[in-house]
A protein has these predicted regions:
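Structural signature of FAD isoalloxazine-binding scaffolds in flavoprotein oxidoreductases
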Residues: 35, 39-47, 73-91, 138-169, ...
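Anion-binding (especially nucleotide phosphate/pyrophosphate-binding) glycine-rich loop
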Residues: 4-133
Length: 190
């Protein structure tokens, strides 16, 4: 059987310490439990994301980005595009001086629990929102009168065009009701 994923990309991803899954089933990565086969790379850092994005651009390989897979309906026929998964490997949560810093793969619920344990307030609205921090920033998630835009200090993202990492201020993210610049932008929240 022929491999779904470009071998050059798979080898580079493995060398960077990412997990390569040649025939992942998207249904195992979406909350609706739908989706067919794909070549998947479980990213482990913004740096590996940037390097792989650069390589895929050079090779003309198309890719899509997936977090916790909430609000995603994937085709049961799968995709030929490489799926870059921002998952548990990018879900660290650190708290210092009343500031929570976390990876885009962290679940919103896990960040809320960490805030509660550290006796921090402001994230109560996000408890129970399915999905990741990256997805929450991407669509300015909110509930019960609170939104991500009310609490975020900055977001780091990788450029889809050149793989560089950039930090965005709340103003630069253009956060509004269920919207951010990332919906029309060429950056991957990390």
């Amino acid at each position: 059987m022929e491999s779904i994923m470009n071998n050059i990309v798979a080898e580079r991803a493995a060398a960077l310490g990412c997990t390569v899954i040649d025939e992942a089933l998207l249904k195992n990565y979406t909350t609706f439990k739908v989706g067919g086969k794909c070549g998947m790379i479980r990213l482990n850092s913004a740096a590996s994301c940037g390097e792989l994005v650069n390589l895929m651009n050079e090779l003309g390989e198309e890719f899509i980005v997936l977090g916790k897979g909430s609000n995603v309906i994937a085709d049961d026929n799968g995709t030929e595009k490489i799926v870059l998964l921002i998952g548990d490997e990018m879900s660290d949560i650190d708290i210092e001086d009343d500031i929570i810093r976390c990876g885009a793969g962290a679940s919103l619920t896990a960040v809320c629990r960490a805030a509660l344990k550290a006796e921090l307030t402001g994230l109560e609205f996000a408890y129970g929102i399915p999905g990741s921090v990256g997805g929450g920033v991407y669509m300015n998630a909110g509930a019960y009168g609170g939104e991500i835009k009310d609490i975020i200090l900055y977001a780091e993202a990788v450029s889809r065009s050149d793989g560089s990492v950039r930090r965005f201020s709340p103003e630069e993210m253009e956060l509004s009701y269920r919207h951010s610049r990332f919906m029309q932008d060429d950056h991957i929240i990390t």
